[in-house]
Amino acid sequence: MNLDNLIDQWFEDRGIVENGKTMSQAIKTLEETTELIDAINKEDRIELMDAVGDIYVTLRGVCKVEGVDFHDCVDRAYHEIKDRKGYLSANGTF
């Protein structure tokens, strides 16, 4: 079983898919995003990795509760950005 399936099963096993609220999962995503910002500010690579993983998990939770495919969402996002021509310069301008 791959990680996505294990994560999805975790949400199923805890009744989150059946009884969860999308807003609750969105709030968890926001909390984890705050932890990511803290990790970046502290230059803590381990905490950064943990936060990125947690954000991924909470976003999968949003999708499970809403009944949408996570990878379809990522595919949509990619198709929105794929033709953009911008480039981030060394001085931080885009």
Please name every model-derived segment.
Residues M1-V52, Y56-F94:
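Flexible "arm" and connector segments at domain edges
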